[in-house]
């Protein structure tokens, strides 16, 4: 599917929906205290980023974005959170700290810096993507073939090591969850013994 060939109005509407998904998803990841909801909203952000790659006619990068970040990293985060099973607070907005103030100042400064850079660029001098479609297709084909051969020939060992790293992270989450369950069981047994001795 070549989204770049859509009519201009549909293209702009699609872009607006993607940006809204990115903005609200990112705000939800930051402000929600429930980690499970934050993880799912992070997956929404990753999907919206892959749609941006589709708008740029980079199908392979969009597919890799979904497979790696949504299919691997985000699912791993969800499984780890579900296994750890931390008690979640019912408060929607967390308490404000000094670190939050510093982060807000830095993010606001970065936002206005990006806005000033965008406004200072002369966009009329940038060539349209449609004019360089043929060159882009040739580069995409060569880059996809190059990436595939590099992953399976030159970088096969690091590629396999990445999967081992994800597996180690999942095993670590399971181990932490089992330790917490053992500690809870020991505390419950201690409390039960104390109650029984008090009754006797």
UniProtKB/Swiss-Prot annotation:
Keywords: Chloroplast, Membrane, NAD, NADP, Plastid, Plastoquinone, Quinone, Thylakoid, Translocase, Transmembrane, Transmembrane helix, Transport. Pfam families: Oxidored_q3. InterPro entries: NAD(P)H-Q_Oxidoreduct_6, NADH_UbQ/plastoQ_OxRdtase_su6, Nuo/plastoQ_OxRdtase_6_NuoJ. It is found in: Plastid, Chloroplast thylakoid membrane. It comes from the Eukaryota. Gene3D superfamilies: NADH-ubiquinone/plastoquinone oxidoreductase chain 6, subunit NuoJ. The keyword Nucleotidyltransferase does not apply. NDH shuttles electrons from NAD(P)H:plastoquinone, via FMN and iron-sulfur (Fe-S) centers, to quinones in the photosynthetic chain and possibly in a chloroplast respiratory chain. The immediate electron acceptor for the enzyme in this species is believed to be plastoquinone. Couples the redox reaction to proton translocation, and thus conserves the redox energy in a proton gradient. Belongs to the complex I subunit 6 family. NDH is composed of at least 16 different subunits, 5 of which are encoded in the nucleus. This is NAD(P)H-quinone oxidoreductase subunit 6, chloroplastic. The gene is ndhG.
């Amino acid at each position: 599917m070549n989204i770049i060939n859509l009519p201009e109005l549909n293209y702009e509407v699609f872009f607006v929906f993607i940006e809204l998904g990115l903005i609200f998803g990112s705000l939800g990841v930051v402000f929600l205290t429930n980690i499970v909801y934050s993880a799912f909203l992070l997956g929404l952000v990753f999907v919206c980023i892959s749609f941006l790659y589709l708008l740029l006619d980079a199908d392979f990068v969009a597919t890799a974005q979904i497979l790696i970040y949504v299919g691997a990293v985000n699912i791993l985060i969800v499984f780890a959170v579900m296994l750890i099973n931390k008690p979640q607070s019912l408060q929607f907005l967390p308490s404000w700290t000094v670190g939050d103030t510093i982060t807000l100042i830095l993010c606001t400064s970065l936002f206005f810096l990006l806005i000033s850079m965008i406004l200072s660029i002369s966009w009329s001098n940038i060539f349209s993507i449609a004019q360089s479609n043929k060159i882009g297709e040739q580069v995409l084909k060569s880059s996809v073939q190059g990436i595939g051969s590099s992953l399976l020939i030159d970088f096969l060992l690091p590629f396999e090591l990445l999967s081992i790293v994800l597996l180690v992270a999942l095993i670590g989450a399971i181990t932490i969850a089992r330790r917490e369950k053992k500690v809870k069981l020991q505390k419950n047994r201690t409390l039960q013994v104390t109650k029984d001795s008090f009754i006797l």
